[in-house]
Amino acid sequence: MSNTDSKTGPNTDPATCELDPAIAERVRFNADGLVPAIVQDITNGDVLMMAWMNDHALAHTLATKKGTYWSRSRQSYWIKGETSGHTQRVEEVRLDCDGDTVLLKIEQTGAACHTGNRTCFDADRLA
């Protein structure tokens, strides 16, 4: 299935996006079909959050340049900022050396964390 709709541009439904086979063979999804995605602010290098992606979420992110993730608790897709307005414009997507983690370098508008903090790593320092 194509990642583009002739009327609206990139598909708005992540479930309909298909990952390029050349990319899919390089990503090592876990047994649940997920890969961790580390989200980093492209302007200052701060790590903002970690979320999970399946192949459709990754395909949707690549096609739309919007941070798209898989919620394990809700068993559904979520596009960052769709309800909060705290959007992520994806500038780069990289795969780590083992192929089992994705790095998204993004431009964040508003808070990245669902708590309202700029980053999910603002609190609870362990050392």
Swiss-Prot record:
Keywords: Amino-acid biosynthesis, Cytoplasm, Histidine biosynthesis, Hydrolase, Magnesium, Metal-binding, Zinc
Enzyme class: hydrolase
Molecular function (Gene Ontology), one example: phosphoribosyl-AMP cyclohydrolase activity
The UniProt record lists the keyword Zinc: yes
EC number: 3.5.4.19
Binding site for Zn(2+): 97, 113, 120
GO biological process entries: L-histidine biosynthetic process
Cofactor: Mg(2+); Zn(2+)
Family annotation (InterPro entries): PRA-CH, PRib_AMP_CycHydrolase_dom, PRib_AMP_CycHydrolase_sf
Binding site residues for Mg(2+): 96, 98, 100
Pathway assignment: Amino-acid biosynthesis; L-histidine biosynthesis; L-histidine from 5-phospho-alpha-D-ribose 1-diphosphate: step 3/9
Chief site of localization: cytoplasm
Localization of this protein: Cytoplasm
Gene Ontology CC annotations of this record: cytoplasm
UniProt remark on cofactor binding: Binds 1 Mg(2+) ion per subunit. Binds 1 zinc ion per subunit.
Annotated S-S bridges: none
Catalytic reaction annotation: 1-(5-phospho-beta-D-ribosyl)-5'-AMP + H2O = 1-(5-phospho-beta-D-ribosyl)-5-[(5-phospho-beta-D-ribosylamino)methylideneamino]imidazole-4-carboxamide
Assembly and oligomerization: Homodimer.
Biological role stated in the UniProt entry: Catalyzes the hydrolysis of the adenine ring of phosphoribosyl-AMP.
Family to which this protein belongs: Belongs to the PRA-CH family.
Full protein name: Phosphoribosyl-AMP cyclohydrolase
Protein species of origin: Corynebacterium jeikeium (strain K411)
Gene: hisI
